[in-house]
Structure formats: C-alpha cells, structure tokens
Amino acid sequence: MFTHLHVHTEFSLLDGACRLDDLVSRAKALGMQSLAITDHGNMYGAVDFYKACKRQGVRPIIGCEVYVAPRTRYDRERVQDKAYNHLILLCENEEGYKNLIAMVSKGYTEGFYFKPRIDRDLLQKHHQGLICLSACLAGEIPQALLERDYDKAKETALWYSDLFGSEHYYLELQDHGIPEQQTVNAGLLRLSRETGIPLVATNDVHYVRREDAKIQQVLICIATNHVLGEDTGLEFHSDQFYLKSEEEMAEIFAAVPQALENTEKIARRCNFDFEFGNTKLPYYETPGGMDHYAYFQKLCREGMVRRYGQHPPKAYVERLEYELNTIQKMGYTDYYLSLIHISEPTRHAQ
C-alpha cells in the first residue's frame, strides 16, 4: 500500500492546483486509505482537508512543507538570506501538531523574509511528535548534492537524523523525469547506505490529474507576472506532479521497494485527530505553579477587600463564594484568569 506524503493543495497559494474535494475523491477512487496535506509554509487548509478526508473515509495526515532559513529566522540580508530550503514535517500526534503550528506561526511573526521561515533553533525546540522528510530539489540535502558537496549533504542528513531520531527522519526520493533528480536520487541512495537513514518515495503532488499540469502553469504565471510560454524560472518542465496511483509509483520506484513501503509505515504512525465541538480554554500559568482555582479565589477575595475593606457585607461574601463555585464547576477558571491577564494592562494604563 502506498500513501502520498507530499501534497500541495489550493492552499499552496498560486502554486498548488488541487481542489480539496477533488483531491480526496481522486485518492479514494485510486484505493488509497490515507493522504497527507503539506502546503507551502502554511496550514490554512488543514481543517477543511481533514473534514474532506473524513467525509470520504480517507485517513488525513496533517503536515506542512516549511521554509528553513539558511542562517537564523531573524537574519535578513538580501544576498545571504533570500535563499531558503524546503522541509516536510508530518504530525504523528497531538504534540506534533502543536509543535508544527508553533513553528509555522513563528515563521510569520519572527522569520518572514520573502517567505515565512523557520530555522534550526525552532526545529530543536519543537521537533517532538513530528516525522521529517528531506523534501524536493529545494531541500537542503538535494541542494548540497546538486552542488556536488556530498560531505555537506551527509553532515546535514546526520544532523536531522540525530535531531528527529532514526524512525522520524527519511530521505525523500522523487522522480518526475527531471535530470537533476537523477543526480540527487543517486546521492540519497548512497547516503542511505552509508548512514542507515531510511528512504521514502513521494511525488510532490501539485495537481490532481496529469492533464491539470497546465492549470498549475497558469498559477505560476500569475504569481510571477508572466504569460504562458514565457520562462518564469519556476516552471516544472514536467507534467508528472499529479496524484499518481500506487501502481504508477511502484513502477517508478521498483528498484527501491522499501521507499514505497515506508510511506505506509509513516501513514500508520500519523494519528492526529482534530476535536471539533469541544471548548478548549487557554492555559494560564500561575505564579509559582499555584493551583489555578486557589489563585483565582485569592485574586477575587483581594479585590473584594480593596473595594469593601476587611469586613465586607455578608451578602457580598456569600455572593462571591457562589460565583466562584459556579465558575469552578463550569471549568471556566482559566478563562477568567486569561481575561484578567488581558484587561490588567489596560486598566493600569488609564
């Protein structure tokens, strides 16, 4: 069984041409049990993709193809820092999802420079619960191999393998008939032999069917302000970036069957589910780790003393205790603590 683990939807803006419902329907028609979403630098489509998969009985795998800064996410020198590398991150569990959204968010708020970029510092802090693939030709390792710098490629692969762990990092093979991919794949096979890092086969899906390749070309032209037929510098020079069947992928990677088998191995391990309909209140960190309800009681009673003195009317005390008990029973303690945290600076600024 083969699973597509590198897929760009319409939410890879002006790049991906896969409409969610059509994408999932096609995967279902091809007999696929699981499917990933890995849009460029964002997770805008994650919830809609998840719902579309659930409606059609396909297991959704939530992920992202992130942009990794060449130095740190804070560096913004045009010559050195405009370049960036791709990296695939897939959520294995809820911890992985939380780590992924943390990194993607910081890519925008802290690392944005042409693209929302993360860096190795964020990966070191937020790698738990994630499965990592080395990505396409724009990945750090493929780029090193294309530069004929095998030592750098090996050093990079070992760094990621050490960080994510031997069962959470894979070297990604792709073959769309592009000459550069043959060079990269040969290097990846050698790396796998020498380091023991496992291989995985993907197709970097950007459109649902082969005949949709022209639609994706139109998107690229819009993004780069070109017309069809002009050299945009971003065109794929191939019509093979579609949602291929298991049989097509097996034919392409017949020499490395373990790379196909690993897609299903990874898919089985990705078990994150959204919980819709459940109220999730923010978690408030109390001073010294004090019990949340006890801290909330303390703040409320101190507030009553400030307003009514050390001996407030009995009716006021009883009303406060009633309100406190009600808030605790409803599970809203953290909600009220968060409101206090938000409103206090405003109150003091007046």
Please annotate each region the language model reported.
Residues 1-343, 347:
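Phosphodiester-processing cores and adjacent nucleic acid-binding clamps
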